Amino acid sequence: MVRTKADSVPGTYRKVVAARAPRKVLGSSTSATNSTSVSSRKAENKYAGGNPVCVRPTPKWQKGIGEFFRLSPKDSEKENQIPEEAGSSGLGKAKRKACPLQPDHTNDEKE
């Protein structure tokens, strides 16, 4: 039971009950036939995707979804990488020395 502000009023008593969604019935041929015909009608009326409240045009710079499927293997390199560095494991490059950080002693002096 959930108590609400209305419970403080004398002489009234309300009980809040959570509702459940109806469950699908499987195995019955008649209900399966009815549910498919009803669901096909619902699918025609429903809006499929996007933002139905504020429809905005697609920007010119945005690629279509088909562009990603039509790319050849040589064009599928990362856009933001330099071609010489793309896919390299770093074996042929000069090794960088690791420079450990010097400990900061400013906090120790204050204590």
From Swiss-Prot:
<comment type="function">
    <text>PCNA-binding protein that acts as a regulator of DNA repair during DNA replication. Following DNA damage, the interaction with PCNA is disrupted, facilitating the interaction between monoubiquitinated PCNA and the translesion DNA synthesis DNA polymerase eta (POLH) at stalled replisomes, facilitating the bypass of replication-fork-blocking lesions. Also acts as a regulator of centrosome number.</text>
</comment>
<keyword id="KW-0597">Phosphoprotein</keyword>
<keyword id="KW-0007">Acetylation</keyword>
<dbReference type="InterPro" id="IPR040444">
    <property type="entry name" value="PCNA-AF"/>
</dbReference>
<protein>
    <recommendedName>
        <fullName>PCNA-associated factor</fullName>
    </recommendedName>
</protein>
<feature type="compositionally biased region" description="Basic and acidic residues">
    <location>
        <begin position="72"/>
        <end position="81"/>
    </location>
</feature>
<feature type="modified residue" description="Phosphoserine">
    <location>
        <position position="72"/>
    </location>
</feature>
<dbReference type="GO" id="GO:0005634">
    <property type="term" value="C:nucleus"/>
</dbReference>
<dbReference type="Pfam" id="PF15715">
    <property type="entry name" value="PAF"/>
</dbReference>
<feature type="short sequence motif" description="PIP-box">
    <location>
        <begin position="62"/>
        <end position="72"/>
    </location>
</feature>
<keyword id="KW-0963">Cytoplasm</keyword>
<keyword id="KW-0227">DNA damage</keyword>
<dbReference type="GO" id="GO:0060090">
    <property type="term" value="F:molecular adaptor activity"/>
</dbReference>
<feature type="region of interest" description="Disordered">
    <location>
        <begin position="23"/>
        <end position="111"/>
    </location>
</feature>
<keyword id="KW-1017">Isopeptide bond</keyword>
<feature type="modified residue" description="N6-acetyllysine; alternate">
    <location>
        <position position="24"/>
    </location>
</feature>
<feature type="short sequence motif" description="KEN box">
    <location>
        <begin position="78"/>
        <end position="80"/>
    </location>
</feature>
<dbReference type="GO" id="GO:0051726">
    <property type="term" value="P:regulation of cell cycle"/>
</dbReference>
<feature type="modified residue" description="Phosphoserine">
    <location>
        <position position="8"/>
    </location>
</feature>
<feature type="short sequence motif" description="Initiation motif">
    <location>
        <begin position="85"/>
        <end position="97"/>
    </location>
</feature>
<feature type="modified residue" description="Phosphoserine">
    <location>
        <position position="28"/>
    </location>
</feature>
<keyword id="KW-0234">DNA repair</keyword>
<dbReference type="InterPro" id="IPR031444">
    <property type="entry name" value="PCNA-AF_dom"/>
</dbReference>
<feature type="cross-link" description="Glycyl lysine isopeptide (Lys-Gly) (interchain with G-Cter in ubiquitin); alternate">
    <location>
        <position position="24"/>
    </location>
</feature>
<dbReference type="GO" id="GO:0005654">
    <property type="term" value="C:nucleoplasm"/>
</dbReference>
<dbReference type="GO" id="GO:0006974">
    <property type="term" value="P:DNA damage response"/>
</dbReference>
<dbReference type="GO" id="GO:0007098">
    <property type="term" value="P:centrosome cycle"/>
</dbReference>
<dbReference type="GO" id="GO:0006260">
    <property type="term" value="P:DNA replication"/>
</dbReference>
<dbReference type="GO" id="GO:0003682">
    <property type="term" value="F:chromatin binding"/>
</dbReference>
<comment type="subunit">
    <text>Interacts (when monoubiquitinated at Lys-15 and Lys-24) with PCNA. Interacts with isoform 2/p33ING1b of ING1. Interacts with BRCA1.</text>
</comment>
<keyword id="KW-0832">Ubl conjugation</keyword>
<dbReference type="GO" id="GO:0019985">
    <property type="term" value="P:translesion synthesis"/>
</dbReference>
<feature type="compositionally biased region" description="Low complexity">
    <location>
        <begin position="28"/>
        <end position="40"/>
    </location>
</feature>
<feature type="cross-link" description="Glycyl lysine isopeptide (Lys-Gly) (interchain with G-Cter in ubiquitin)">
    <location>
        <position position="15"/>
    </location>
</feature>
<feature type="short sequence motif" description="D-box">
    <location>
        <begin position="23"/>
        <end position="34"/>
    </location>
</feature>
<dbReference type="GO" id="GO:0005813">
    <property type="term" value="C:centrosome"/>
</dbReference>
<feature type="modified residue" description="Phosphoserine">
    <location>
        <position position="31"/>
    </location>
</feature>
<keyword id="KW-0539">Nucleus</keyword>
<dbReference type="GO" id="GO:0009411">
    <property type="term" value="P:response to UV"/>
</dbReference>
<dbReference type="GO" id="GO:0048471">
    <property type="term" value="C:perinuclear region of cytoplasm"/>
</dbReference>
